[in-house]
């Protein structure tokens, strides 16, 4: 393992994690599946269960910008209300969707190409996998449901395709105790439906929008424009710090610019110097991502972005501050790029005006 880490830190070995593999599989399988698969999953969630489902994430973006061409690699919801049978019904109905579209999904899975040998690092453990020889992928017929007690605001329920990956000459598993060779498949979760179970009554802004991907008269309940913008800004921050490909960051920026164009004119009238609220100051135990989210939630995306740039230019609040989701990564090699990534994020949000 030490030899792999030396190669990683020298830049000889690319930093590819299990999460990167799962993200690539979403791009190559779910995003390339026929639209009927995502539509069936959407209806399995919304139409067959009680409570209130609010569409969020990338699907909400397509609704607000009336985009009928973007491919969706997952659908995200906020769920308000509680039904004891909801989780079982939801998994059963989504399993039926996968069963119905299995042949197509299986073909897309087998078409995914990965070069060999391939080294994949574990995110939260000091370990890695090295796949030797031709790499083959197989789609498991059964989906997986993962429930997480997330925070005081919501719990998270995610549904995933299970992809088994094997290599012709076996897999070397690197751990603290040495190297173990195995022929057993590696299993990866490809999340295609995410549901946040909200713990508070619904009191947020929402709107009805046409989901043009599904048809001209297909109306859905989505998060408000400002909330969708704030969520996408946080996603942009994560894209930059997790070293997503430039084309993905550019695509995110393109969508953000279209969302900003829909904001009412009065959103731009406030001056950052007119606001001396305490939210401009990061609390001692507050993570940098929570601080950014707080600024955006309190001030809205237009004024919030200007406040963030003002704080960045006049204080050292962001200096050396690594987002919380990266502090838990073991062997993350790009900590030295932290300040450079903050500069890139601020340049990106400046370009939105």
Swiss-Prot record:
Induction trigger: Early protein.
Disulfide bonds: none
Any Pfam family: AcMNPV_Orf18
Keywords: Early protein, Host cytoplasm, Host nucleus
One GO cellular component term noted in the UniProt record for this chain: host cell nucleus
Compartment annotation: Host nucleus; Host cytoplasm
Domain of life according to the entry: Viruses
Main subcellular localisation: host cell
Role, per record: May play a role in occlusion-derived virions (ODV) formation and/or regulation of late viral gene expression.
Protein name: Protein AC18
Species of origin: Autographa californica nuclear polyhedrosis virus (AcMNPV)
């Amino acid at each position: 393992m030490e030899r792999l880490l030396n190669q990683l830190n020298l830049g000889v070995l690319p930093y590819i994690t299990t999460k990167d593999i799962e993200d690539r599989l979403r791009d190559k399988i779910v995003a390339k599946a026929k639209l009927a698969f995502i539509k069936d999953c959407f209806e399995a969630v919304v139409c067959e269960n009680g409570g209130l489902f609010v569409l969020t994430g990338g699907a909400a973006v397509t609704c607000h910008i009336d985009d009928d061409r973007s491919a969706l690699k997952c659908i995200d919801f906020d769920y308000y209300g509680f039904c004891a049978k909801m989780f079982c019904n939801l998994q059963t109905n989504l399993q039926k969707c996968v069963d119905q579209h299995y042949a197509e999904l299986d073909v897309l899975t087998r078409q995914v190409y990965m070069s060999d040998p391939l080294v994949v690092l574990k995110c939260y453990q000091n370990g890695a996998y090295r796949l030797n020889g031709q790499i083959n992928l197989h789609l498991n017929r059964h989906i997986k449901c993962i429930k997480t007690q997330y925070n005081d605001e919501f719990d998270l329920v995610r549904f995933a395709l299970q992809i088994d990956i094997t290599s012709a000459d076996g897999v070397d598993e690197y751990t603290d105790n040495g190297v173990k060779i195995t022929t057993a498949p590696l299993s990866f979760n490809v999340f295609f439906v995410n549901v946040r179970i909200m713990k508070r009554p619904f009191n947020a802004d929402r709107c009805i929008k046409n989901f043009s991907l599904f048809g001209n008269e297909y109306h859905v309940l989505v998060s408000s424009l400002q909330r969708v913008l704030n969520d996408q800004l946080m996603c942009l921050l994560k894209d930059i710090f997790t070293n997503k490909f430039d084309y993905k960051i550019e695509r995110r920026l393109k969508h953000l610019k279209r969302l900003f164009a829909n904001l009412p004119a009065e959103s731009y009238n406030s001056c950052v110097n007119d606001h001396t609220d305490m939210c401009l100051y990061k609390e001692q135990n507050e993570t940098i991502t929570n601080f950014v989210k707080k600024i955006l939630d309190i001030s809205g995306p237009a004024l919030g972005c200007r406040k963030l740039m003002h704080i960045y230019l006049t204080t050292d609040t962001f200096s050396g501050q690594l987002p919380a989701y990266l502090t838990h990564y073991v062997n993350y090699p790009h900590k030295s790029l932290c300040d450079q990534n903050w500069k890139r994020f601020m340049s990106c949000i400046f370009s939105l005006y």
